[in-house]
């Protein structure tokens, strides 16, 4: 049997070497790319190893290395984020209260490995709803509905203290805690509105009474002044006849000024002007 020898293709060894080099280069680039990861600003990273589990080290912002196929980077956002929770509960005097709480929450950066082991990456959804609702119900139940309004700042401080302490037990930091909503049942709201209207009417009535009292005092003072003036005039007339003449002259002057401004001409004698010769 005759076997024909396949002729060598010119350049085949070079092409084969080029292919091998390309494969090796591609694998090298893949390994390099897989062994690097970036941590953006405001984030932190922890690394999970398939053999040893979560490492205790927390990686800051920047580029870091890991073992491809054996290690995986887990990124956490450590910036403060708002979270709002509304709860319906009852006050000490059995009034229905709807209260809303807003918190700025973030994970404690140096506790990320423990957070991942116990809560995972969605730590906020696992912890915050329960501790906020329990705290709101416990604190609101200590106050009457009216005190929740008048002592709102004290209520807010107490809620902030309890929620912050409970969140810290789960390695969660709260940068701000504030009451955003406070509503009551329909009956209590109507009672408050009626009370406010009654208070306004009482203030208005008080003002009217005080004004009437002031007017009364003013009238008395004015009457006393007029009586005193009449008394003094009477004494002046009795003691000095010249005072009567002076009053007549003043009256005549006023009459003359009035007539001077009139368009009609009027002739008056001295008796009409209340002036007579002595």
From Swiss-Prot:
Family: Belongs to the prohibitin family.
Cross-referenced SMART domains: PHB
Key word Thylakoid present: no
Lineage: superkingdom: Eukaryota
Chain segments annotated as coiled-coil in the UniProt record: 186-220
Membrane disposition: Single-pass type II membrane protein
Gene Ontology CC entries for this record: mitochondrial inner membrane; mitochondrion; plasmodesma
Function recorded in the entry: Prohibitin probably acts as a holdase/unfoldase for the stabilization of newly synthesized mitochondrial proteins.
Record keyword Transmembrane present: yes
Sequence intervals crossing the membrane: 15-37
Residues exposed to the Mitochondrial intermembrane side: 38-278
Quaternary structure annotation from Swiss-Prot or TrEMBL: Component of a prohibitin multimeric complex in mitochondrial membranes.
Keyword terms of this UniProt record: Coiled coil, Membrane, Mitochondrion, Mitochondrion inner membrane, Signal-anchor, Transmembrane, Transmembrane helix
Organism: Arabidopsis thaliana
Gene3D superfamilies recorded: Band 7 domain (3.30.479.30)
Gene: PHB7
Record topological domains on the Mitochondrial matrix side: 1-14
Compartments reported by the entry: Mitochondrion inner membrane
Name of the protein described by the UniProt record: Prohibitin-7, mitochondrial
Major localisation: mitochondrion
